Amino acid sequence: MFTILTMLFILATARVMQYSGMIAAVAALFSVFGPVYPFFAPMLGALGTFVTGSGTSSSALFGSVQMSTAASIGANKYWLVAANSLGVATGKMMAPQSIAIGLVAVDEAGRDGELLKKVLPYAALFIIISALVCFFGQYVWAIFGIA
């Protein structure tokens, strides 16, 4: 029951963001980065998942931001939405909700901080690799005429 309510509120928030012009405003802010923005795109997905604990929620909230930013900087919108999804995986590995659920499952509740400290270096490495793939990948795909 609570899961359904949470998803409804997340989707409602995404719609409010769209109708109020927040998505366009945030996209305009991110477009300042210009052609370098795809490097930062996975970080937005990771942040969304870290905060909400859900990849679906992060995609609902920030997928439109990625598409609008892509239009602003002349990048491939599918590439940036995929970059957001790549960041979602990173955010999920360090999301407090995911860590708490995992620790409860193995009867180690209360050791959240300890596990987060162990996960952060791997998450940081993964997000840096993801950012590099997203940045350089857009040019590689463009060379082959795919993007």
Label every model-predicted segment:
Residues 1-7, 37, 121, 126:
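Helical membrane-embedded segments and adjacent short helical loop/helix-boundary regions
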Residues 5-17, 34-65:
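Hydrophobic alpha-helical transmembrane segments of multi-pass integral membrane proteins
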Residues 6-8, 36-50, 73-97:
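Alpha-helical transmembrane segments of multi-pass membrane proteins
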Residues 14-26, 51, 134-145:
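Transmembrane helix-loop junctions in multi-pass membrane proteins
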Residues 17-23, 56, 97, 101:
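Short glycine/threonine-rich loop-to-helix capping motif typified by GTGT followed
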Residues 18-35, 64-65, 73:
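Membrane-interface interhelical connector segments
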Residues 28, 51-85, 122:
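Hydrophobic transmembrane alpha-helices that form the pore/transport pathway of multi-pass ion
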Residues 89-147:
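Juxtamembrane and boundary regions of transmembrane helices in multi-pass small-molecule transporters
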